[in-house]
Amino acid sequence: MNTSLKPGTTLYVGTAIDTIWSQIYYHVWWPGQGNDPMYLMNQSMNRTRNNYYENNYTPHMYTNGKDSGSGTATWISDPKTYLEEVGLYEINLIGTRSGNEISFDVKMNAIETTPTSQDLRLFVATVIDTVHYPASPNGLTEHHNPVIALLTGNTGKQMKFISGITYTESFTWSMPSGWINHADISWKSSGLKAVAWIQNYKSKEILQVNEFGFN
């Protein structure tokens, strides 16, 4: 999946998508020995999200909540189907970083008021752009965009939007000590970023997403 962001590779999605999409990764406890540190450092979150998507194999990609499977053809084609869609929601993030601590605001608004029957949820993830794991049992020593934590909870925060109203959520977060002191992985705090998205919890469709880098 990582090669989809590398120009010149056969899996590259193209500049039209490269500049606008957000990729995040949840880690799993199988098929290997269950010793992936990016899974072990937040088992509850990784299990909750994998179970939500009913994921039972890896690698396994979802695009805006749609199952894109494990085939490289759909990894390339599925994101392109959303290029002409117009979103009804807007998300903007702004913040600062001091060492391993970040503070930021997520601002949201909607064109339409949320129907009472619709279950929309806000997810806000802290993510690191690159993690080096030289001792990886499966030989994949460089990992991109693993989710560290979900700041609105593993099942998100329910939101009801009123058209024309701006909603703000504020966060201050520090890198967990397990990540800072882990002997088997390395990363740079300049690679920290926050990713926020609004998701229809029933259909799994992601209605809007944005991210902010703290480098």
Across the structure, where does each feature detected by a protein language model lie?
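Local sequence-structure signature of Cys/Sec-based thiol-disulfide redox active-site neighborhoods
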Residues: M1-V28
